[in-house]
Curated annotation (Swiss-Prot):
BP terms from Gene Ontology: cellular response to misfolded protein; chaperone cofactor-dependent protein refolding
Record SUPFAM superfamilies: Chaperone J-domain
CDD domains to which the protein is assigned, alphabetical: DnaJ (cd06257)
Subcellular location: Endoplasmic reticulum membrane
Membrane-crossing residue ranges in chain numbering: 228-248
Bilayer topology annotation: Single-pass membrane protein
Claim: Calcium is one of the keywords in the record: no
Protein name: DnaJ homolog subfamily C member 18
Gene assigned in the entry: DNAJC18
Keywords: Chaperone, Endoplasmic reticulum, Membrane, Transmembrane, Transmembrane helix
One GO term describing the cellular component: endoplasmic reticulum membrane
Domain J, first and last residues per copy: 82-146
Length: 358
C-alpha cells in the first residue's frame, strides 16, 4: 500500500513539473494564453492580429489605393460648371497660363497616378477643356455662348454633356503625348483603359433602362397593318411629290465641271473673263447673241463665287496649321503652313482685276 502511494505521488510531481515547463495547459491554445492573469492581453493580441491582416490586405491592393486629396480633387472637377473652373484659371488667362495649368492637372489626374473613382473622366474633362480654350476660335465662340451649355456630371448620373460646338478637335491622349514627349512620365500608359465600378454600373443600368424603354415602345406600336400604313402615308406622299418635282425640273444649260452623266461634255470659255465651262450638244441652238452674253455673265458670277469660297477654305486651313504650330511649337507644322499655297486666292485676284478692267 505504501509503495502504491509512493508511485502516485511521483506521478503527480511529474505532471506538475510538465505543466510548469509548458506554462499553460495542453488543451489551451497559445493565442488565448493570458500570461498576466487578465483577459485584456488576449483582447489586445486579437486586435493586433486583425490590424496586421488588414494592413497586409491593403498592401496587396496597392495598385488601386488613392488618397483623400485625390478623391477631393476628382470631386472638385465634377462640380465645375465651365472649362475655366476645370483648369482653375481666370477667363482672361493667357496661353502660357493655360499650358501651365494643364500640365499640372494632367500629371495629377492621369489614370496611372490617380486611381480615385472618376479620375479617368476628370482627366478627359481636363484635356477637353484645354483643347477648346487653347484654340482662339473655339474659345471665342465658347465665351460668346456662355458656360451654361457645358456641364460635367458624375458618372452615375450621365456622362459628359458638353455643347457640341465646343468639342475638342484633339483627344486628351494626343494632348498628353504632345506635352510629355509621346509618353507619360510614370512609364507604361493605359490611358482610359481603367474602367471604374461606377462606369460598369452606369452601363448596366443604362442598358437595362434602354431595354425597358424599347419594350414599352414596342407595346405602344400599332399592331395592325392598316394603322402602320396610315402612319406611313404622309411620308409616301412627300417622296412621290419629290420624285415628280425632280422629273419636271429642267437641268441648267451649263456646268462649271465636266459631267458626262448629264451630257455636259463640250468645253467652252466666256468671252470676257475666259472662264471655262461645259455644255451639252444642243447648247448652240438655244443660246446665241444677247441670250449667250447674259448667260456668260451668270457663269462668270457663279465661277467667282466658287473661287471665293475655295480661297476662304485655303486661308482657313493655313490659319489652323499656323495656330497648331504655335500651340505645340512644332517646326514641321510651321513649315507646312508657310509652304501652303493659296492658289484659288491668286485666281480670285486675277479675276477681280480682269473684271474691273473689262
Amino acid at each position: 500500500m505504501a509503495a502504491t502511494l509512493g508511485s502516485g505521488e511521483r506521478w503527480t510531481e511529474a505532471y506538475i513539473d510538465a505543466v510548469r515547463r509548458n506554462k499553460y495547459p495542453e488543451d489551451t491554445p497559445p493565442e488565448s494564453h493570458d500570461p498576466c492573469g487578465c483577459c485584456n492581453c488576449v483582447k489586445a493580441q486579437k486586435e493586433k492580429k486583425s490590424e496586421n491582416e488588414w494592413t497586409q490586405t491593403r498592401q496587396g491592393e496597392g495598385s488601386s489605393m488613392y488618397s483623400e486629396e485625390q478623391l477631393l480633387g476628382v470631386q472638385r472637377i465634377k462640380k465645375c460648371r465651365n472649362y475655366y473652373e476645370i483648369l482653375g484659371v481666370s477667363r482672361d488667362a493667357s496661353d502660357e497660363e493655360l499650358k501651365k495649368a494643364y500640365r499640372k492637372l494632367a500629371l495629377k489626374f492621369h489614370p496611372d497616378k490617380n486611381c480615385a473613382p472618376g479620375a479617368t473622366d476628370a482627366f478627359k474633362a481636363i484635356g477637353n477643356a484645354f483643347a477648346v480654350l487653347s484654340n482662339p476660335d473655339k474659345r471665342l465662340r465658347y465665351d460668346e455662348y456662355g458656360d451654361e451649355q457645358v456641364t460635367f456630371t458624375a458618372p452615375r448620373a450621365r456622362p459628359y454633356n458638353y455643347y457640341r460646338d465646343f468639342e475638342a478637335d484633339i483627344t486628351p491622349e494626343e494632348l498628353s503625348n504632345v506635352f510629355f514627349g509621346g509618353h507619360f512620365p510614370t512609364g507604361n500608359i493605359h490611358m482610359f483603359s481603367n474602367v471604374t465600378d461606377d462606369a460598369h454600373y452606369y452601363r448596366r443600368r443604362h442598358r437595362h433602362e434602354r431595354t425597358q424603354t424599347q419594350k414599352e415602345e414596342e407595346e405602344e406600336k400599332p399592331q395592325t397593318t392598316y394603322s402602320a400604313f396610315i402612319q406611313l402615308l404622309p411620308v409616301l406622299v412627300i417622296v412621290i411629290i419629290s420624285v415628280i418635282t425632280q422629273l419636271l425640273a429642267t437641268n441648267p444649260p451649263y456646268s462649271l465641271f465636266y459631267k458626262s452623266t448629264l451630257g455636259y461634255t463640250i468645253s467652252r470659255e466666256t468671252q470676257n473673263l475666259q472662264v471655262p465651262y461645259f455644255v451639252d450638244k444642243n447648247f448652240d441652238k438655244a443660246y446665241r447673241g444677247a441670250s449667250l452674253h447674259d448667260l456668260e455673265k451668270t457663269i462668270e458670277k457663279d465661277y467667282i463665287d466658287y473661287i471665293r469660297t475655295s480661297c476662304w477654305k485655303e486661308k482657313q486651313q493655313k490659319s489652323e496649321l499656323t495656330n497648331l504650330a504655335g500651340l505645340y511649337r512644332d517646326e514641321r507644322l510651321k513649315q507646312k503652313a508657310e509652304s501652303l499655297k493659296l492658289e484659288n486666292c491668286e485666281k480670285l485676284s486675277k479675276l477681280i482685276g480682269l473684271r474691273r478692267g473689262g
